[in-house]
């Protein structure tokens, strides 16, 4: 009888991490559905092959995002957001002003902001995702937060997104950083 334990483990790994990794990819790649799906799929396949070693859910999630971020550096991400990208991000609760602010940031800044403030990973996991030390990751997240706020226009703030959405977290981070102005 064949041993399906490796295949079963990889399937469970994909089931556990697939949706959230795809969401990370969608925001990181500014709503580019095709690129996000391709990168998330490749990352799940490659990193998932080592699923037995990645038993701790947060460490596995950080390892997946680190791999996806490295792969995304080679992806062409449009800085000018299309209507389709804006619609995709709106579906995640990220309004046009927030999307434009994210679009003006570097991939690394977006990864820092998403992992530290939206997904709320611990500092060590953010360091893994960014491929740096914990103190450097802490500084990178603070810099990304500051850059996001600087680029988010005060007069064109998004309507509050549905509670629990990624967009709610983006707006909450903005509000904390701006002292309640967002």
Q: Which residue ranges define each predicted feature?
A:
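Short loop-to-helix capping motifs
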Residues: 31-32, 50, 155
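Short, Lys/Arg-enriched anionic-surface-contact patches
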Residues: 94-105
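Short amphipathic alpha helix immediately N-terminal
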Residues: 105-125, 129
């Amino acid at each position: 009888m064949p041993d399906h334990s490796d295949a079963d483990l990889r399937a469970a790994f994909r089931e556990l991490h697939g949706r959230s990794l795809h969401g990370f990819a969608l925001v990181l790649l500014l709503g580019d559905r095709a690129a996000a799906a391709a990168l998330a799929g490749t990352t799940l396949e490659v990193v998932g092959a080592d699923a037995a070693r990645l038993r701790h859910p947060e460490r596995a999630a950080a390892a997946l995002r680190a791999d996806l971020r490295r792969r995304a550096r080679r992806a062409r991400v449009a800085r000018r957001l299309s209507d389709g990208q804006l619609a995709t991000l709106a579906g995640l609760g990220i309004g046009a002003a927030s999307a434009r602010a994210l679009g003006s940031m570097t991939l690394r800044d977006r990864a820092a902001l998403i992992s530290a403030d939206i997904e709320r990973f611990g500092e060590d996991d953010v360091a893994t995702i960014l491929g740096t030390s914990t103190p450097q990751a802490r500084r990178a997240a603070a810099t990304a937060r500051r850059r996001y706020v600087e680029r988010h226009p005060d007069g064109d703030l998004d309507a509050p997104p549905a509670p629990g959405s990624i967009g709610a977290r983006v707006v909450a981070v903005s509000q904390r950083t701006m002292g309640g102005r967002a």
